[in-house]
């Protein structure tokens, strides 16, 4: 069907262009920024700070701020943080000695024109136990020391709040209410169960897609052998039909992928906004509907109750021949995608996003094929360099990681682009999500599905084939990605940096050891005996 093929190609390009690195999407709570000045007394890491408040003794709101490069470190547990009364500075910027007397209160000040260290020293000299600085915008600014300043004598914590949080507290205090608060910076757990589930989700997606792809190819091969044995004229028609919905990656397209994907990523980076995210949501819904419909139709067709509807077709204007089963399932898929798009800001929306995403990935891995190891090597090598460049190297040109900024949607006011699988971090005091980009599943998955197709066509057992090795290599590479993620305090990691060497290395080593490397590299299919040979009588 023409529409199905065009949507399949769209799904492939869409899935590849919009993939991102694997990283925790809660906002890094620890920033090791070596580009900003450090010296004794001014070498703290930038950490996010929780500020739970009480108004007249009742729990109110919890705000989030950021700590300064200087001053003492904060407690990591709420039970150890002291509940302290909040006071407003007079003058508001605290650049000169406050008129009001302080006896251990936390002082709320405006950013003003003097340095952060100056106002901190003034507040400390006036008797403040901590200082909250209201920023001029909703962003959190990194508070550093000025050149030549002596900060060794600063002994009170310094925290910056966004302007909306600061003004809210200021208005409450001005209304003569008694505001008390705590300051603490909880640490993230070394491992969150969300990462385990995300690992299982990624591995399971490739596993399902691989067996579906291999089963389809084997059925085509069996049917082809049967027609060839019978000498049927339907052989040519079968070859044309079987390849109609398949997109084969070539060396040229693998190389062009890096160029096109890089241009698209820069466009996303420059044009990122609320409305641009809305466009991406619409595109994701289109791909998700196609993927979910394809998966459901194929799954239900395995049951005899639905098989008859899946094999009966009706002509639909502009669409061509469509099965009755597809017509019945399509409205449900559209309704599901629309429901997710409308409710995507809710806490449970990640479930719908993952269902649509997994369906899209499985469909792409079913219709897109790597013909041989040579193409797979070029594709993964290009993606390997692409991932590293846009996660790490781009920081030197753009002063921030382009890949991570795009994936998190930092400039859009949204939670990030929808082309991600994500699971909420269940035991993380900061919340957020563990996420993985589509490309970190699709690109390695293309080579894993290729390995299983080769094994089935060559009648190899699981232990003697290549699928078990490549599948294990992917799982191990992804596991090391999460280890690196935790070692780097949640900073974004290019998953392909760890996955690609494992997968390619496994295929090359096993192929060389078993003598199949030349076949894997060139044809990508094992030599199979012609059915006619078995039918020829032996000459006496």
UniProtKB/Swiss-Prot annotation:
Motif mapping: PAL: 494-496
Entry annotated with the keyword Transmembrane: yes
Topological domain ranges for the Lumenal compartment: 27-195, 270, 343-347, 394-431, 486-489
Transmembrane segments annotated in the record for this chain: 196-216, 249-269, 271-291, 322-342, 348-368, 373-393, 432-452, 465-485, 490-510
MF (Gene Ontology): aspartic endopeptidase activity, intramembrane cleaving
Cytoplasmic topological segments: 217-248, 292-321, 369-372, 453-464, 511-540
Glycosylation sites: 56, 135-136
Signal peptide positions (record): 1-26
Statement: the UniProt record of this protein carries the keyword Glycoprotein: yes
One GO BP: proteolysis
Enzyme Commission code: 3.4.23.-
Modified how: Glycosylated.
First-listed, main subcellular location of the protein, grouped into a coarse class: membrane
Location in the cell: Endosome membrane
Cellular component aspect of the GO annotation: endosome membrane
Gene3D superfamilies registered for this protein in UniProt: 3.50.30.30
Task performed by this protein: Intramembrane-cleaving aspartic protease (I-CLiP) that cleaves type II membrane signal peptides in the hydrophobic plane of the membrane.
Matches recorded under PANTHER family: SIGNAL PEPTIDE PEPTIDASE (PTHR12174), SIGNAL PEPTIDE PEPTIDASE-LIKE 4 (PTHR12174:SF102)
Entry's family note: Belongs to the peptidase A22B family.
Annotated protein name in UniProt: Signal peptide peptidase-like 4
Source species of the chain: Arabidopsis thaliana
